[in-house]
Amino acid sequence: MTASTHPVGVPAAFWRGMRDSVPFLLVVGPFAALFGVVATEAGLDLAQTMGFSVLVIAGASQLTALQLLTENAPVAIVLASALAVNLRMAMYSASLAPWIGGAPLWQRACAAYLLVDQSYAISLSHYERTPALTMPERMALFLGTIALIAPVWYVATLAGALAGRGIPDAFALDFAVPVTFLALIAPALRTLA
């Protein structure tokens, strides 16, 4: 096959996705550790904190839910707010559908679970630059993007939860969640558009 019809190969696509995810680890690790600390400070035990991170794997949604839970908000409000924060995932899914929508159902289910901002941004960028990628190459690239991010998210959450147990109550971390959200929205506030 020529380079234009088979530009990468499945293993190379996976490694490319993994390589391109490395810079994001500088953000994912501390953010996950912060979640672990804040979750522990909010009263979640280690199993609850880790279960939350493994099941949800969506930092902004997790912090939103955690903040509302600490304020004794009704469960319906917590769930609705967490879903609202993650509405962007529906848009991400829709824009990835032309690229990976033809993959087997089990692969699409894995992609849906592993869809985070970083895996979306890296994958879509590659798909648009290299439209000749085959479906197996596209899925390999997508899985490569998350191959480091997900484990780092889990390990950093664990480290934060363990560290959070040792933080005295005198060092209240109530400011951590609002500061995190300001950090998330600040880039969007650079322009009036």
Question: Where in the sequence are the language-model features?
Answer:
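Hydrophobic core segments of alpha-helical transmembrane domains in multi-pass membrane transport
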Residues: T157, V179-L189
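Hydrophobic mid-bilayer segments of alpha-helices in multi-pass membrane transport proteins
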Residues: D45, F175-L182
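Helix-loop-helix hairpins and the membrane-proximal interhelical loops
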Residues: M1-I57, Q67-A82, R165
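A generic, lipid-embedded transmembrane alpha helix
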Residues: I57-L66, A90
